[in-house]
Amino acid sequence: MPVISYFFGIYVRMYNDDHAPPHVHVEYQGHEALVAIASGDIIEGALPRRAARLIKEWCLDQQAAPIEDWQLAQALLPLKRIPGADND
């Protein structure tokens, strides 16, 4: 599963042809969660408060780019790297 963004130790990944709603897979220090792109809310799993806040802000700030990657993933096309909250 490609890493589409990495910031502050948070890995953001996306599967090709994954189930709806549009979401990202987030890993941080042994915690895993599915996070809705539209809202930044955790829809499955759990993250520490700080990581949850950072990923929510990232989803809301970068919303167009993860949605574009979601559409590429559904079409089984290569995904684009998205800048992290630390602007990497």
Which stretches of residues belong to each language-model region?
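Basic nucleic-acid-binding interfaces
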Residues: 1-88
